[in-house]
């Protein structure tokens, strides 16, 4: 399997892991659809109110506080990039530890009642050196 296919496979596994953790309050799987004029979350109109957080730029001990600040401002979603040049600095060597632990960040968002909108790299529009 070439490097590109390994990377695509890993991204798909990450997406499946994130989605498998998404449950509504009753414990059953939720739904997200595009309605005629709005998004529908579990069959009800849903407006995405999103803030963007660059988890790799914030010390881990401040992650939850930043998520809570976004929620206090009325947001319901956190947009995050997967900064791929941080997670795979050398071909085939992946780092999702410490400040790079994107899954831990997603779990904190979920714990605080927030949704995640994941935008995988390699390109990120945030003044980030490739």
Task: List where the protein language model places each region.
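Bacterial N-terminal signal peptides that target proteins for export
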Residues: 1-9
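Bacterial Sec-dependent signal peptides at the C-terminal "C-region" and cleavage site
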Residues: 5, 15-30
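Generic detector of short alpha-helix boundary/capping microenvironments
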Residues: 9, 31-32, 97
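The two-metal-ion catalytic cores of nucleic-acid processing enzymes
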Residues: 12
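An acidic-aromatic substrate-binding cleft motif
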Residues: 28-62, 67-77, 82
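Aromatic-lined substrate-binding rim segments of carbohydrate-active enzymes
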Residues: 63-130
């Amino acid at each position: 399997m070439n490097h590109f296919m390994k990377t695509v496979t890993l991204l798909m596994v990450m997406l499946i892991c994130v989605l498998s953790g998404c449950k509504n309050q009753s414990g059953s799987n939720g739904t997200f659809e595009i309605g005629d004029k709005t998004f529908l979350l579990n069959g009800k109109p849903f407006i995405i109110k999103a803030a963007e957080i660059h988890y790799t730029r914030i010390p881990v001990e401040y992650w939850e506080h930043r998520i809570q600040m976004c929620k206090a401002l009325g947001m319901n979603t956190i947009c995050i990039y997967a900064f791929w040049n941080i997670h795979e600095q050398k071909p085939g060597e992946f780092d999702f530890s410490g400040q790079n632990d994107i899954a831990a960040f997603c779990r904190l968002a979920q714990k605080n009642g927030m949704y995640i909108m994941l935008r995988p790299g390699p390109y990120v529009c945030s003044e980030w050196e490739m």
